[in-house]
Amino acid sequence: MAGLLSTFDTFSSRRSESINKSGGGAVIPGQKSTVSVFVLGPSVTDDADKLFIATTFLAHSLNTDKQHSQRGGFLVSLLAMAYSSPELYLTTNGVNADVKYVIYNIEKDPKRTKTDRFIVKTRDMEYERTTEWLFGPMVNKSPLFQGQRDAADPDTLLQTYGYPACLGA
C-alpha cells in the first residue's frame, strides 16, 4: 500500500503545475473550471459495489478520449473514496480562487434500473447526465472490461495492467 500511495504523491505533484490553468480534478463536460471530487455516499456499503465503482473509475482514467483529458482526477477521487476524505484532494492541490470545488456523492438507488442502480448527487440535486456519463454504456465498452464489466475481478485487472498502468503513471 505504501508504494501505491507514493505513486499517487508523485502523480499529484506532477499535475500541480497545470492545476491553475485547468482546475484539475475530474472535470466533467461543460464544467471546465470546476474540480469535481467523487466520494462514496453512506448507501454504498457492499464490497462488490465498491469494486465496481473503482473499476469504473479506472476505465475512465485509462480512457484517452478528449472528454477525459483530466483523467487523473478520477484516480484522486478513488483515493478520496478509499479514505472517505475529499479534503485530501483539496489540500493536496491547494486552492485556486477561480475554481469551484464540488463534492459529488455516489449513492445506491434500488429504484433505478439503468446506470447499475447508482446516482450522482449533491445535497441539493441529482445529476442524471453526469450519472449517465460515468456509469453509462461507454464504460462497458472500455478495453478494461472488454464488454464484460460485471465479470471483471481485481486480480485479472492487476495482472493485465499492473498498479502503475492503473494509476496513469
From Swiss-Prot:
Forms the helical nucleocapsid (NC) in a ratio of 1 N per 6 ribonucleotides, protecting the genome from nucleases. The encapsidated genomic RNA serves as template for transcription and replication; encapsidation by N is coupled to RNA synthesis. Forms the encapsidation complex with the phosphoprotein protein P. Before encapsidation, the newly synthesized free N protein, so-called N0, is chaperoned by P. Its main location: virion. Signal peptide: none annotated. Homomultimer; forms the nucleocapsid. Binds to the viral genomic RNA. N0 interacts with the phosphoprotein (via N-terminus); this interaction allows P to chaperon N0 to avoid N polymerization before encapsidation. Interacts as N-RNA template with the phosphoprotein (via C-terminus); this interaction positions the polymerase on the template. Belongs to the paramyxoviruses nucleocapsid family. This is Nucleoprotein. It comes from the Viruses. It comes from Sendai virus (strain Harris). One of its GO terms (molecular function) is RNA binding. It is found in: Virion; Host cytoplasm. One of its GO terms (cellular component) is host cell cytoplasm. Most abundant protein in the virion. Since the viral RNA genome consists of 15,383 bases,there are 2564 molecules per encapsidated genome. The keyword RNA-binding applies. Ncore is globular and carries regions required for self-assembly and RNA-binding. Ntail is an intrinsically disordered monomeric domain in the C-terminus. The gene is N. One of its GO terms (biological process) is negative stranded viral RNA replication. Keywords: Host cytoplasm, Ribonucleoprotein, RNA-binding, Viral nucleoprotein, Virion.
